[in-house]
């Protein structure tokens, strides 16, 4: 019988995901500016949805780039 270790979320469930916290949001996008999938980030489904909304808001307000041309 094998046991699976439960992965802990990198963000505490009680912590809000804010679109103004650009340093936190940058951890969850690729160098090209794409949002990382949930299986890579280790977030819960609710946190991943909130993260996607926050990243999209930050992009609209020009806090994050839509497409990063540097990479």
Swiss-Prot record:
InterPro entries: Ribosomal_bS18, Ribosomal_bS18_CS, Ribosomal_bS18_sf
GO molecular function, one term: small ribosomal subunit rRNA binding
RNA-binding found in the keyword field: yes
Gene Ontology CC: cytosolic small ribosomal subunit
Assigned keywords, A-Z: Ribonucleoprotein, Ribosomal protein, RNA-binding, rRNA-binding
UniProt keyword RNA-binding, yes or no: yes
Alphabetical GO biological process terms: translation
Tree of life domain: Bacteria
Pfam families: Ribosomal_S18
Stated role: Binds as a heterodimer with protein bS6 to the central domain of the 16S rRNA, where it helps stabilize the platform of the 30S subunit.
Family: Belongs to the bacterial ribosomal protein bS18 family.
Subunit structure: Part of the 30S ribosomal subunit. Forms a tight heterodimer with protein bS6.
Protein name: Small ribosomal subunit protein bS18
